[in-house]
């Protein structure tokens, strides 16, 4: 229901072509995505309460937005801000003070919202989000702050190689890949490994990649991806 409230706030903001009010920002920040709740899209299920919710959601969203949201149920899991604050603290201890930052799976922008103010003042940020609703919430929250918000897949984004000082995210993971015709060593890798490989391509020498990812990144029986990463970066 917090998601529905956030979507209604977003529709009002976009319909009136204005920035979010303080109360609307709070509503947008409570948007949790649809990860783990596929019943929200099953209007033929057995639970009447969920069937009603699914019907209301279908009426609320355009067909494209509904399809995009439904496609996000496997990977739309947003990181607890407590964890993100610890990540920023660790990056500061590693000496990061600001620069060109990329968030390639940004959700509604919690990694950006938790960024220390002094680092934010010294940084330029690009944030990519595949899901249409999450991406538009991200833009409503942070677009006016100068964040370059791109709604689409990381694989489709035009990014200069060797550009970013810091790339951080909670990346999607699973036993599936992405459509990538670049013929890179990671092009056919599982999605979480693909994100690591692509991040290293657009990272500048000496830059930092900080990802929350699957344990299969290190545990997978095929060592090819680990060998590629080890040849490109210090772990």
Kindly label every feature range from the protein language model.
Residues 168-176:
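A short SAM/SAH-binding and catalytic strip from SAM-dependent methyltransferases
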Residues 144-154:
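Conserved SAM-binding strand-loop segment of SAM-dependent methyltransferases
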Residues 130-132, 188-235:
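Conserved Class I SAM-dependent methyltransferase catalytic core
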Residues 2-141, 145:
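Class I S-adenosyl-L-methionine
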Residues 77-82, 186-193:
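Conserved phosphate-coordination/catalytic loops
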Residues 178-182, 195:
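A short, conserved alpha-helix within the catalytic core of class I
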Residues 13, 176-177:
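Helix N-cap/beta-alpha junction loops of NAD(P)-dependent oxidoreductase domains
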Residues 158-168:
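A short acidic, Gly/Pro-enriched loop at the edge of an enzyme's catalytic core
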